[in-house]
Amino acid sequence: GFARAWLDFSSTYQPQLLLPFQLSMGLMTLFISVGIGASLARQNGLDPVTTGLLCLMSFMLVAAPVKDGAISMQYFSGQGIFTALITAIYAAEVYAFLKRNNITIKLPPQVPTGVARSFEVLIPVLVIILTLHPLNLLLENSTGMILPEAIMSLVKPLVAASDSLPAMLLAVLVCQVLWFA
């Protein structure tokens, strides 16, 4: 009946049916990276688009290794969430610090605004690349893991511990107690 027809249909068209999932949940960390960057930019009085793109670049720098001539998307889904959080906060804070302390390239007022902005962000881009990329390379050469793998291995015990009935009961209890605080 219907179940058999659906099974045949879904197995025939599986790539097309999974496309919406892959373009949303499969790219979740890219949205998280840009969103955190834009939010932190607003808090620090910076341009949200520039900061969001800077955070996206920092995440992709450590979480998108090239394998067989293509970018691996392994950490673009749920596996890369912690890495997206950490790299976005790092990139946004580095950019805010450099901007606050006027460590940017200043061009004369005659230069068009768009060109001046692209040069303004050059030093933060260099600082982020020159800190995150060597860290990722050092980690990969010493442990065989890139940053997202290392972060996941550090968080794995916490995730495993929270995946139990006592942990869920404790979480609900804490929420209920803190609701009244």
Which residue stretches match the model-derived regions?
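Signature of multi-pass transmembrane helix bundles
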Residues: 1-9, 13, 17-25, 30-180
